[in-house]
Every structure is written in C-alpha cells, then in structure tokens.
Amino acid sequence: MNVYTEHGFASRAEYLLTLSDEYDLPLAVVELVASQLGDTEDFDGLLVELSSIRELRSYSI
C-alpha cells in the first residue's frame, strides 16, 4: 500500500486528476505544479499552491 491508496486513490495520476476537478484547474497546471514541488508535497504544499492559483484566477482585470 502506498500513500495514495491510503488516501483512497488508485495512483498519483488519479489523485492529481481529482485535484484538477476539485480546484477547477486544468490537469496540465496541476501536473506542472506537482512536478515542480515533488511528490513529498502532494498532500501539503501542492494543496496550498493550487488554492493560491485558483484564487488568483478568480480576479479579472
């Protein structure tokens, strides 16, 4: 069992796809941020970054 299955996901890919849906962000954005942070940040720093990106996208000029 790995950290993703412990949290109810079949794989990291499934987890990132779920985050893409939850944060209403393109999967490519989620994958890019995840690759930059590394998998050790998947359940901490990644969530903070995705939340920040979602908030920034809510502003319009």
Report each predicted region and the residues it spans.
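N-terminal acidic leader/helix
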Residues: 1-32
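Short, charge-rich amphipathic interface segments used for partner binding and complex assembly
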Residues: 21-61
